[in-house]
Amino acid sequence: MLEVGTIWGFTSTTMASIMFLWPMYKQFVPYQLREYLENTIQKYLDKLFRRDSNFVYIRFPEYTGEGLSKSRAYDEIGNYLSSISTARAKRLKAKESENSKSLVLCLDDDEAVVVVFQGVNVVWSSTVVDKEDKHNSKEGRYLTLTFENHHRDIITNTYIDHVLREGKEIALKNRERKLYTNNDSSSYSSWWEGLWSNVPFNHHASFETLGMDLDKKEEIKKDLIKFTKGKDYYRKVAKPWKRGYLLFGPPGTGKSTMISAIANFLEYDVYDLELTTVKDNAELKKLMLDTKGKSIVVIEDIDCSLELTEHRKKKKEEDEDKEEKKEAENLKRVSGNNESNVTLSGLLNAIDGLWSACSDEKIIIFTTNFVDNLDPALIRRGRMDYHIEMSYCRFEAFKVLAKNYLENESHDLYGEIGRLLEEVDVSPADVAENLMPKSDEDDADICFRRLVKSLEEEKKKKIEKEARKNKKKAEDNVKQEKQNKVKGMVTK
């Protein structure tokens, strides 16, 4: 009878060889033949390894909870394996990292690596279920830990904790913040392609460079810091550890820049949720569940994303009075599956219902140009806890922009610019455009004079607009007086 050590050495060599040949095997061998061979090999392996219960297998799937959420353990184990695979694995997968000068190498799919922990040999293998295997499609990717049964205590009580701890430390060291966007539900046919796509988050906005009143910026920063330290407090008051921010104001006032500044200040990932591509309420719930903690979920221009406004509520009442609700639903069915069926109640439940407590330390931000158009239920305190008005550019915000764009903190034109900014409404984006040098010859003086000229033109337009408005009002008054006289004569 073979000794356990002999079997173990044979197993390690065999698994490494199989993982090396596996991609070619899947590519060139027909599926029906593969299925037969795999069943035969499985029977052999069962007899070889499981007959005396010498080996234990622990599987760590990529997704947990019936595929609803990403497994943290899977990610942490992946980080751990990436640190040891470079020198040991035959096949590696290369990934770019913004925080590293070189490529990050990790264990490739369908590959195995042998690890020694306190004198104990274990095998880690990475597996991807064949997409043609419909019965196991929910397995997706998974990592398997194999070890001898008599080492069960040290593996389950010590080694796994060691792996997860190492994985967390590596993640913090090499953390690269991401900007996510949800995939169009009509563009992917299989769940393993993922609900979210991501790119590195490289926006460099900060509160220091944000064109806004200094006191207001400090107030927002203090609120954010208080939130990040509020884990115990939120648990004490029995509330999910999340906070909602509503950014509202005219176009160009810096709402998107504010989001980037918040993300950089907290070092959070950003999930840009495009509601119009979400199929229905169930898919919206899955998207929210698939977001991680220490993140910001953003819905920009929410008044334009879906019909979630007060106008929709009034229209619905009119439709019910005219008994047109059924007809509208029929038309919706005919329009096909590409139209989003997300409802206001579905959105409210996703951000503030029972499922919202499934992940901690999360900020939800809505932006809108027209806050009065939004349904009051959507922006009430408790959902959108902090309302931040992004207003037109005034003198304090101008000074921040002048320092950022021109490295200038004083000029003879500051007084005139401050006076004009109080008289006209211009966005920080418009001011920044005038302050930005257009050529190498443009110095601070040229840029400030260009801004003054632009502000004077805006003031002229404002005066002309008010004059036209007053003229029309006077004409309307004269017209109304004539109508009243005629009406009085007819009455007599």
Swiss-Prot record:
Start-end of Basic and acidic residues biased regions: 323-332, 462-484
Residues noted as binding ATP in the record, renumbered to the chain: 249-256
InterPro entries: AAA+_ATPase, AAA_N_dom, ATPase_AAA_core, Mitochondrial_chaperone_BCS1, P-loop_NTPase
SUPFAM superfamilies: P-loop containing nucleoside triphosphate hydrolases (SSF52540)
A cellular component annotation (GO) from this entry: plasmodesma
Membrane topology of the entry: Single-pass membrane protein
Catalyzed reactions: ATP + H2O = ADP + phosphate + H(+)
Top EC category: hydrolase
A Pfam family the protein falls into: AAA_assoc
Family to which this protein belongs: Belongs to the AAA ATPase family. BCS1 subfamily.
UniProt-recorded name of the protein: AAA-ATPase At3g28520
